[in-house]
């Protein structure tokens, strides 16, 4: 291990040792929005993830919760294509503006903000709202796709494949002004984002990644390096020189479709359960997670109720492991074992037998 990597890991361990007994204050925002793409059903993602036990799981971890409920986005009655291609630009722009306000309120109130989508165009709003209070944030984008097409390079017209292009400062001379998007201010730079899990990248996106020096780890890189080394290098890049808030944007299609079948754009050869949860466990261990998106759960695309439940349950695992659930068992701090000399000796003995 390099000296830099060793020092970075040591610093993260020290931060974790200070914070490991702290209680997370977590705000949960449901974002039932589907107009960043054309497949219906992803608007039911928040309800599915809630039904899979999200709030109880976070509560059992000792989190102090504030539930903003599922947002009611303002409908746009007439939302014509932009440039005869881009789908629902006004709806996407307005929904993200509304979401950014709620995320901003949550972060300013001292909460770690969890947004459950909904499609990945919502990251425009979550990262914009987060950056208002944490302008130096770093983004870890876990996804099968880079989502960095511009409105001029996209072939699908779907804005859930373009959110990063609106957020990245270096791309602003390549991005036209879409109706409904005038409020957006680019808020991250190329060195402030790292991709993990890529395996379906369009040619223009690959050009952007290479020519704008954006760090990414494809599934081939994960196979070659191993997920531990990928996370070490990710942290070296984002927090190796200075500690700063982390925004984790996690698309459920980062996982292999055998694990997360109920999603709109599945791609074979994705993350295993162990790899995906290792990512979130390591992010939690930094003590720096400030906001998390969990997107693209689409229960309507499951071929069975079991597939829908499995995908939603996996989403809950991703979120819970980001806030302290471990595979050794997620526990509220247990400070002391009962002793035979305690007043409730018989009751303690019975508890130990159980």
Swiss-Prot record:
Pathway(s) annotated for this protein in UniProt: Nitrogen metabolism; urea cycle; L-ornithine and urea from L-arginine: step 1/1
Cellular component GO terms, alphabetical: cytoplasm; mitochondrion
Xref: SUPFAM superfamilies: Arginase/deacetylase
Subcellular location: Mitochondrion
InterPro entries named among the record's database cross-references: Arginase, Ureohydrolase, Ureohydrolase_dom_sf, Ureohydrolase_Mn_BS
This protein's UniProt keywords: Adaptive immunity, Arginine metabolism, Hydrolase, Immunity, Innate immunity, Manganese, Metal-binding, Mitochondrion, Transit peptide, Urea cycle
GO terms, biological process: adaptive immune response; arginine catabolic process to ornithine; innate immune response; urea cycle
GO molecular function annotations of the record: arginase activity; manganese ion binding
NCBIfam families named in the record: rocF_arginase
Name the UniProt record assigns to this protein: Arginase-2, mitochondrial
């Amino acid at each position: 291990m390099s000296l830099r990597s060793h020092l970075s890991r040591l610093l993260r361990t020290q931060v974790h040792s200070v914070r490991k007994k702290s209680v997370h204050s977590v705000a949960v925002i449901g974002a039932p929005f589907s107009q960043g793409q054309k497949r219906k059903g992803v608007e039911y993602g928040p309800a599915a993830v809630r039904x899979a036990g999200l709030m109880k799981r976070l509560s059992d971890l000792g989190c102090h919760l504030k539930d903003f409920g599922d947002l009611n986005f303002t409908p746009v009655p007439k939302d014509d294509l932009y440039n005869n291609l881009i789908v629902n630009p006004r709806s996407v722009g307005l929904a993200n503006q509304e979401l950014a306000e709620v995320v901003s309120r949550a972060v300013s109130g001292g909460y770690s903000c969890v947004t459950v989508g909904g499609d990945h165009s919502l990251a425009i709003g979550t990262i914009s709202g987060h950056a208002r209070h944490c302008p130096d944030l770093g983004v870890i984008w876990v996804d099968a796709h880079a989502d960095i097409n511009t409105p001029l390079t996209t072939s699908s017209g779907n804005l859930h494949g373009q959110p990063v292009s609106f957020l990245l400062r270096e791309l602003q001379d390549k991005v036209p002004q879409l109706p409904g998007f005038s409020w957006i201010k680019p808020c991250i730079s190329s060195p402030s984002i790292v991709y993990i899990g890529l395996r379906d990248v369009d040619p223009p996106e690959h050009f952007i990644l290479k020519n704008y020096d954006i760090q990414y780890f494809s599934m081939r890189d994960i196979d070659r390096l191993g997920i531990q080394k990928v996370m070490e290098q990710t942290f070296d890049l984002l927090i190796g020189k200075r500690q700063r808030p982390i925004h984790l944007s996690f698309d459920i299609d980062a996982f292999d479709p055998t694990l997360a079948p109920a999603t709109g754009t599945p791609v074979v050869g994705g993350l295993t359960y162990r790899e995906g949860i290792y990512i979130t466990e390591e992010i939690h261990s930094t003590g720096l997670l400030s906001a998390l998106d969990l997107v693209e759960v689409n229960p309507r695309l499951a071929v069975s109720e079991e597939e829908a439940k499995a995908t939603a349950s996996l989403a809950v695992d991703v979120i819970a492991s980001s806030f302290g659930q471990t595979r050794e068992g997620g526990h509220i701090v247990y400070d002391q074992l009962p002793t035979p000399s305690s007043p409730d000796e018989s009751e303690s003995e019975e508890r130990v037998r159980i």
